[in-house]
């Protein structure tokens, strides 16, 4: 019985989950919900099902795997990762993992907050000014390692790829000063399962955000 991943028909919070499902060769199907156009942005496709799925905290994305019904994107990632030994093992690795998971979510939210703000054009320069310092910290944290926890890929690398690459989409030159982050992106995209997925019709790199966003809505 394949797992079911439910989310809007966008990249959004599901990108790293889809990538991890593909990398682990998991059997899954997607339930993609479509949001209506402006000005109403009708969400009835999702709202009609929201409280009928048996979710403890009904939200998108969700993952249903038999009797396991999970919401919260990082909880979903951790669930898949545990099945495939893609979590940190030592105390040091788990500390790095926990820090990174939350740090990348902060960075993800900063970009999302900007892109949904009606004053996007006014606020964009401030974001771009702060971006190099943020990326510098990630570059230092990665160092000369191939993956963020060391020699072994883990689920936080999937979050890292999503956040770093969407900033690269937002500002194409942002990683130029950080060759190890650029190499990380290339290394990730070069993984056999990831490369195959990116060439498939299932791959959904855009739109980054919902139709309500000022940037990344197409």
From Swiss-Prot:
Q: Where in the cell is it found?
A: Cytoplasm
**Enzyme group, top EC level?**
transferase
* Enzyme Commission number(s) from the entry: 2.5.1.18
Task: Give the residues the record marks as binding glutathione.
Answer: 7-8, 43-46, 50, 59-60, 72-73
Q: What is its main location?
A: cytoplasm
GST C-terminal domain location is 90-208
Instruction: Identify the keywords attached in UniProt to this record, alphabetized.
Output: Cytoplasm, Lipid metabolism, Phosphoprotein, Transferase
Lipid metabolism: present as a keyword of the record?
Answer: yes
**Phosphoserine sites (modified residues):** 27, 44
GO CC field: cytoplasm; cytosol; extracellular exosome; intercellular bridge; sarcoplasmic reticulum
Listed under GO biological process in this entry are: cellular detoxification of nitrogen compound; cellular response to caffeine; glutathione metabolic process; hepoxilin biosynthetic process; linoleic acid metabolic process; nitrobenzene metabolic process; regulation of cardiac muscle contraction by regulation of the release of sequestered calcium ion; regulation of release of sequestered calcium ion into cytosol by sarcoplasmic reticulum
Residue stretches making up the GST N-terminal domain: 2-88
Q: Name one Pfam family in it.
A: GST_N
- State where substrate binds: 116
Q: Which reaction does it catalyse?
A: RX + glutathione = an S-substituted glutathione + a halide anion + H(+); 11(S)-hydroxy-14(S),15(S)-epoxy-(5Z,8Z,12E)-eicosatrienoate + glutathione = (11S,15S)-dihydroxy-14(R)-S-glutathionyl-(5Z,8Z,12E)-eicosatrienoate
Q: Where is this site: Important for substrate specificity?
A: 210
* Tissues and organs where the protein is expressed, per its UniProt entry: Muscle.
The Swiss-Prot or TrEMBL record annotates one GO molecular function as: glutathione peroxidase activity
Q: What does this protein do?
A: Conjugation of reduced glutathione to a wide number of exogenous and endogenous hydrophobic electrophiles. Participates in the formation of novel hepoxilin regioisomers.
Family per record? Belongs to the GST superfamily. Mu family.
Its quaternary organisation is: Homodimer.
Name it.
Answer: Glutathione S-transferase Mu 2
Q: Which organism is it from?
A: Homo sapiens (Human)
The organism that produces this protein has a lineage beginning with: Eukaryota, Metazoa, Chordata, Craniata, Vertebrata
